[in-house]
Design a protein with these regions (language model features):
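A detector of tandem-repeat and repeat-rich interaction/domain scaffolds
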Residues: 1-64
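Intrinsic low-complexity/IDR segments
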Residues: 45-46, 50-146
Length: 146
């Protein structure tokens, strides 16, 4: 743990977790399984992050409805984003704005790609459909209305 990280509450960190770059972690948080958290991440509430998760950029994860478990999967870099579910919809990390809303992720696939391209990222297009199919299976609650 380095880089001026601040950790409070009933946080448990184990199994080769790496936390750096001014990350803030508060609350009943359990982090394990080679997790890498960096880049001013702000994680608060009742959260479990496990199994090779990567949380980077200015990620904000607050107040989950329940524990959230990340299996090792394309979810970590879904379309070049890190993607999280929380009470306010979907938050993303990386170089994207923090104020994405659920509305951003609805509509046609073509519209979604154009919106992402608008923010200056083109490399995600490879394996795009495969990752979308994965996400639709993983988040069935009408987040993805292609």
């Amino acid at each position: 743990i380095g880089g001026h990280a601040r950790i409070g509450g009933n946080t448990r960190i184990s199994q080769n977790a790496r936390i750096d770059d001014k990350a803030n972690l508060y609350g009943d948080i359990w982090i394990c399984g080679k997790t890498h958290i960096s880049g001013n991440a702000d994680i608060r509430g009742r959260i479990v992050i496990a199994d090779d998760s990567r949380i980077c950029g200015d990620a904000i994860i607050h107040d989950m409805y329940d524990y959230l478990y990340f299996p090792p999967s394309p979810l970590d870099y879904f379309l070049g984003l890190s993607l999280y579910r929380c009470k306010d919809g979907i938050l993303v990390s990386g170089k994207y704005p923090k104020d994405f809303t659920e509305e951003f992720f609805t509509g046609t696939l073509e519209g979604f790609i154009e919106k992402i391209k608008y923010f200056g990222n083109y490399y995600f297009v490879e394996n795009c459909l495969k990752r979308i199919e994965f996400a639709k299976a993983y988040f069935p609650e009408a987040y993805f209305n292609w």
